Amino acid sequence: MNRRYALVLSLAALFTDFALANRSFAQAKSLKDQLVGTWIYISSTGKREDGSDVQRPSLQGAVTYTADGRFHFITTRTDNPKYASNETTRPSPEEAMAVASGSIAYTGTYVVDENTKTIHLNIETSTFPNLVGAPNQRRIITSVAVDEMKFTNPRTPAGVTLEFAWRRAK
């Protein structure tokens, strides 16, 4: 009698574990669902095609992905100068050059390819106009967790591969 009871308990435990595992698997979030939200810039590295490192400036920024397929991206140098005129439309030539060369922002729509872990971007507006409508704008997700994400921009217009690290905004 005790053997039957032990067998029944073992089988019940096995089926319960199986059912819970399947329920957890079915409830797993899609990659797109994991991306939705705002992410704060942590760091980035760059490599040229020959494998040499590209010096990266100290940056701050954020990227936001919405559930309806829109995104917004901005990074800017932490050492950008303040405008002496204190007016956004009246920087000195040096101030304007520093800000223009030390900042990038763009926005548009995105689609996630779950199989290749790739974010395909359609850039509609950018501080670098050459990106608007440019083909094959993609980011490859290298890792994503509840509070941290990393992606690679496989080839910038300058021929550099960038790896970005982000933490989820709280």
Q: What function would you assign to each model-found segment?
A:
Residues 3-7:
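N-terminal export leaders
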Residues 11-170:
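Lipid interaction determinants
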